A protein has these predicted regions:
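Bacterial Sec-dependent N-terminal signal peptides
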Residues: 1-21
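Boundary/junction segments of secreted and surface-exposed precursor proteins
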Residues: 20-29, 122
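Aromatic (Trp/Tyr) and acidic
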Residues: 25, 29-106, 112-113, 127-183, ...
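Active-site-surrounding "flap" and adjacent substrate/cofactor-binding loops of secreted or lumenal enzymes
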Residues: 104-105, 112-125, 193, 208
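Acidic, glycine-anchored loop motifs typical of Ca2+
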Residues: 203-214
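Carboxylate/His-rich catalytic cores and anion/metal-binding grooves
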Residues: 214-239
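Acidic/His metal-coordination segments adjacent to aromatic residues that form catalytic metal sites
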Residues: 272-282, 333-339, 382-386, 427-438
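Aromatic-lined, polymer-binding surfaces characteristic
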Residues: 286, 290, 294-304, 312-362, ...
Length: 587
């Protein structure tokens, strides 16, 4: 009998070891706030039955908590088993790991300070993306921007629009994403000023200048927007085009040619279809771009006035003028392409008008702007990708409507609008082990951040915890609680599993990651297989996890899932600063 029991024990031990090799426990590598929802996810290539899990002290290895598992459908991620492991009731600070038989998670922390410094950390990427003078490279680039194109009378003239940020790992610059990035950083500072330090000066070099670093970065964006809108009704939407896509090189060594000598083309906002070659966009008006100018100028004027009063007054005036111009030719203004059919396919503009009117109301307290905001806000109650679960590339942009949050303080119907958007996402995620109802389009991580932002705004406005578990799951997704077990932010957390080989010249030529950058994120297999020019450069370390609905590669050759973006990174500012604020509140 004893021998038989020993054999059974060895048999189960063998099974445990076998499962440990193809079963994984995914966690938020950054850690968990003590009072927050805390969940890990187990996925397995085997059909296994698990009822309980243990939380162990990382130093003593003693069991500090036992919890029950909850089974979910694993098939969507190409697995046979999936369980959610909820340990929210355990609130003691410290270092821990989760264990189920021989399956162990990485170690993680529970503490109120796990998000401290993260909102400042992502500004490293914004500084790295600066055009003109680049503090990361300590060098300058694109000092001859640019030559006007598509203007009825000024085509061929020089215009000084040096500055701003490169959009991603290419060196194009778009008003669309730059204005949104500027606004997002200002919005974060408006709501969570205590999360931001002063460790860099206005040029982006280390050293205090008496101004929070996030305002330094937003000011950098505002100065460029000011150049791109030199006079009433004269706005520019883009510098360069996809002729830029000629391979890896540092921005200071940019050799892309546009037939303009040392200059790059600067696209005038015409309100009509644009494209200097075969491929054209589908522009129908000026509203989406002009209103983005207005919202960034209006909020910027309020927040930088203490430090730059003259400039603040200048852009306050431009904000009102930009809104007036936005109403003059209703429609969307898309980015322009040249050698390929890829561009930002923005198709909504009423959200931009709503937000611009909100910020002008905040700036001026004029009833006209409030009435305008309500008018436009009622046209699009829910950002369309949230309700439909699909979108083309940047079809509904910005990905979150922050005008609704402003109006929710005045009219309860806008709280309903915020809730409706979250409910659509929630209904798509209920059966997913990672509670992720985001469509895996190109730049899916930007949608994750948008959903997180809306969830946090809704909770701030209502204290309704209906979506708090989904919010936690999406937050954890960005830090490693996903099928691949990787953080989606380069360099965060330190010592964790994060993108080491993003699609970037910084990585290719300098052998460094793009610290602070949020990568595009997992993309639907069908989209991935139909994109041009993707060639993996190494063996896929995540091969076991590519059999589900979406794929991700930490590979320089995959621009679809592993390229950091400037606007996505900036959009993280509000959420990360909110989490730091939450942790510090509970200390």
């Amino acid at each position: 009998m004893r021998k038989r029991l020993l054999c059974i024990s060895i048999l189960f031990s063998t099974f445990d070891s076998l499962y440990a090799g193809n079963s994984w426990i995914r966690i938020n590598q950054l850690g968990y706030l003590p009072d927050a929802v805390k969940v890990a996810v187990l996925i397995s290539e085997e059909d296994i039955r698990i009822g309980h899990f243990q939380l162990r002290n990382a130093i003593t290895e003693t069991v500090v908590y036992k919890g029950q598992t909850k089974e979910y459908d694993a098939s969507g991620w190409g697995m046979k088993s999936a369980y959610r492991l909820d340990f929210s009731n355990f609130k003691n600070a410290g270092g821990y790991y989760i264990q189920i038989d021989d399956i162990k998670s990485p170690c993680f922390r529970i503490a109120n300070d796990v998000y401290n410094g993260t909102a400042d950390f992502i500004l490293n990427y914004m500084r790295q993306q600066r055009c003109g003078y680049n503090p990361y490279l300590k060098d300058s680039c694109h000092l001859n921007d640019g030559i006007i194109v598509d203007h009825p009378t000024k085509t061929g003239r020089e215009i000084d629009v040096t500055g701003g940020w490169h959009d991603a790992s290419d060196y194009l610059q778009y008003l669309t994403t730059s204005a949104n990035a500027t606004y997002q950083m200002l919005f974060a500072y408006l709501h969570n000023p205590g999360a931001y330090g002063d460790n860099y000066n206005a040029k982006g070099h280390k050293g205090k200048n008496g101004i929070p670093d996030i305002l330094d970065e937003a000011k950098w964006g505002l100065e460029w927007l000011d150049k791109m809108n030199p006079a009433y009704g004269e706005m520019y939407n883009q510098i360069a085009d996809d002729r830029d896509h000629i391979g890896y090189r540092l921005p200071s060594k940019d050799t892309a040619g546009y037939g303009l000598g040392k200059h790059r083309p600067v696209y005038y906002i015409t309100g009509k279809q644009q494209g200097l070659a075969k491929h054209k966009n589908r522009t129908t008006g000026v509203s989406s771009s002009a209103a983005k100018f207005a919202s960034a100028f209006a909020l910027g004027a309020q927040l930088i006035k203490e430090y730059y009063p003259v400039f603040a007054n200048k852009i306050a005036k431009k904000a009102a003028e930009a809104y007036e111009f936005a109403l003059s030719d209703l429609g969307v203004c898309q980015t322009a392409c040249n050698v390929s059919p890829y561009f930002y396919e923005e198709e909504n503009y009423v959200d931009d008008l709503e937000l611009a009117a909100c910020e002008l109301h905040r700036l001026t307290n004029k009833k006209y702007y409030f009435d305008q905001a309500v008018k436009w806000g009622a046209v699009e109650p829910v950002t369309p990708w949230m309700s439909s679960g699909r979108a083309r590339h940047y079809q509904f942009y910005p990905f979150v409507n922050l005008g609704h949050y402003y109006l929710s303080e005045k009219q309860s119907i806008y709280i309903d609008y915020l809730k409706d958007g979250l409910q659509f996402i929630y209904e798509r995620c209920e059966k997913d082990p990672f509670l992720n109802g985001i469509p895996f389009i190109w730049c899916s991580n930007n949608l994750v951040v948008a959903a997180l932002t809306q969830a946090r705004c809704y909770y701030n406005a209502t204290k309704d915890s209906t979506y708090i578990k989904m919010e936690a799951a999406l937050r954890d997704w960005l830090f490693g609680c996903n099928p691949w077990g990787t953080s989606m932010i380069c360099g965060l957390p330190a010592g964790g599993d994060y993108p080491q080989l993003p699609h970037s010249s910084i990585t290719y030529l300098l052998n460094e990651t793009t610290y602070g950058g949020l990568i595009d994120g997992p993309v639907d297999k069908t989209i991935y297989n139909n994109l041009r020019g993707i060639h993996l450069l190494k063996k896929d370390e995540y091969a076991p996890f590519q059999n589900g609905k979406a794929v991700y590669h930490d590979d320089m050759g995959d621009y679809s899932s592993n390229e950091p973006t400037m606007d996505g990174t900036a959009s993280l500012s509000f959420y990360l600063s909110s989490m730091e604020k939450e942790g510090n509140r509970n200390k």
